[in-house]
């Protein structure tokens, strides 16, 4: 199959860019963008490679994505080696095919076609690419955004190429994401012999009523754009492994995916009040990995919906479900942010794949979005 989108995707897949190692992917993208007149600024932080590229001036549409991928798992379980792209029955297999090297290829090819047809486009077209999205995300998009904000860089619209679709490309568009707040909680007790509980203070027993009440809380109601806030306990650890020793500490880690109905400070206050109510001795550490954000109907959402309807003849659902993405950092710049990418059914899985025709379709959608906003 000869297609510039597929060929570029295959070239990217062949580079085993396990997060945060870029493995040469960005050099490939930069070469293509510079060839059509983009100015490229490398913005590396620690072990992470990033770049910000732009062409033109004025109202700015940026395409954002990541070159890094998650580990492939057991390579012997793949139908072909995970970093050797293969097409079978119209499906392109390889780690990163859907998340998100296919989107990157579609973006770049769309830009090449757009510039060829609109060499003097009136707005500014930009790219924000990182090699640290799948792992810590500490030195990737967030650092680039901070640097751009420090110099008052303009960003009006941003399309993130995360795999948003469920069954066919464009059936779901993400116009927002929930916030994510993690609590690392240690309940302190006194270690002792199980036969002499009066000489010890078992933190598991002490914390049980607190945890029971915590999981029963209804944090908020859903609203027009977001599902109700959810809380899930992710990890619990206590004890020495011996059956005759009561633990001295209980560690509990739980995560909130919260809507715009709440703030992280409201959640923290409610948890701390509950800890005090149960008279627990505790140490707590919070990690806010992202605030909720929402892009209402406007020029970007309308352009994305128009592109999907034009090429796939379906009306996309606008959803805010799922995990976090780098869109949460970009939204801080005041930009309208939307995610549109391929079908996500196999992301992070053995035999990750994407319909090759979907990537061709995605490139056309991206180009039409460019034409509506910055031509």
Curated annotation (Swiss-Prot):
Q: Does the keyword Metal-binding apply?
A: yes
**Which Pfam family is one of those matched by this entry?**
M20_dimer
The UniProt record gives the binding positions of Zn(2+) 1 as: 66, 99, 162
For the protein in the UniProt heading, the enzyme class is hydrolase
Recorded E.C. number(s)? 3.5.1.18
Q: Name one GO biological process term.
A: lysine biosynthetic process via diaminopimelate
**Record keywords:** Amino-acid biosynthesis, Cobalt, Diaminopimelate biosynthesis, Hydrolase, Lysine biosynthesis, Metal-binding, Zinc
Reaction(s) catalysed by this chain's protein: N-succinyl-(2S,6S)-2,6-diaminopimelate + H2O = (2S,6S)-2,6-diaminopimelate + succinate
| Keyword Ligase set for record | no
According to the record, how does the cofactor bind?
Binds 2 Zn(2+) or Co(2+) ions per subunit.
SUPFAM superfamilies, per the entry? Bacterial exopeptidase dimerisation domain (SSF55031), Zn-dependent exopeptidases (SSF53187)
Q: Please list the cofactors this protein needs.
A: Zn(2+); Co(2+)
Under the heading HAMAP family, the entry gives:
DapE (MF_01690)
Q: Family per UniProt? A: Belongs to the peptidase M20A family. DapE subfamily.
NCBIfam families in UniProt:
dapE_proteo, PRK13009.1
Chain's role: Catalyzes the hydrolysis of N-succinyl-L,L-diaminopimelic acid (SDAP), forming succinate and LL-2,6-diaminopimelate (DAP), an intermediate involved in the bacterial biosynthesis of lysine and meso-diaminopimelic acid, an essential component of bacterial cell walls.
Q: How does it assemble?
A: Homodimer.
Instruction: Quote the protein name from its UniProt record.
Output: Succinyl-diaminopimelate desuccinylase
Which organism does this sequence originate in? Answer: Shigella dysenteriae serotype 1 (strain Sd197)
Lineage start: Bacteria, Pseudomonadati, Pseudomonadota, Gammaproteobacteria, Enterobacterales
